[in-house]
């Protein structure tokens, strides 16, 4: 039995590419994605929304959304 994921791997790759192109330093953006994934993993340890979507994938999606839609960042 094959599990169906709720995301498209090609879309994830495209979003990751967009993040890399927008960043001035590839290493720094990679570290930022990793830090966000780690933080989200511990923040939502008990509340599991989508067990198929791993924290790094969720971090890439969130960061690319923030890049393309700056109005979603509310401070």
From Swiss-Prot:
Q: What class of enzyme is it?
A: transferase
Query: Which catalysed reactions does the entry list for this protein?
Result: RNA(n) + a ribonucleoside 5'-triphosphate = RNA(n+1) + diphosphate
**Classification via SUPFAM superfamilies:** RPB6/omega subunit-like
Cite a single GO BP annotation. Answer: DNA-templated transcription
Cited InterPro entries: DNA-dir_RNA_pol_omega, Pol_omega/Rpo6/RPB6, RPB6/omega-like_sf
List the GO molecular function terms: DNA binding; DNA-directed RNA polymerase activity
- Record has Transferase as a keyword: yes
- The question of whether Transferase is a record keyword is answered with yes
Which Pfam families does this entry report, sorted A to Z? RNA_pol_Rpb6
| Keywords of this entry | DNA-directed RNA polymerase, Nucleotidyltransferase, Transcription, Transferase
Q: Which GO terms describe its cellular component?
A: DNA-directed RNA polymerase complex
Enzyme Commission number: 2.7.7.6
Coiled-coil intervals: none
Function according to Swiss-Prot or TrEMBL? Promotes RNA polymerase assembly. Latches the N- and C-terminal regions of the beta' subunit thereby facilitating its interaction with the beta and alpha subunits.
Note the subunit structure: In cyanobacteria the RNAP catalytic core is composed of 2 alpha, 1 beta, 1 beta', 1 gamma and 1 omega subunit. When a sigma factor is associated with the core the holoenzyme is formed, which can initiate transcription.
Give the family from UniProt. Belongs to the RNA polymerase subunit omega family.
Q: What is this protein called?
A: DNA-directed RNA polymerase subunit omega
* Organism of derivation: Picosynechococcus sp. (strain ATCC 27264 / PCC 7002 / PR-6)
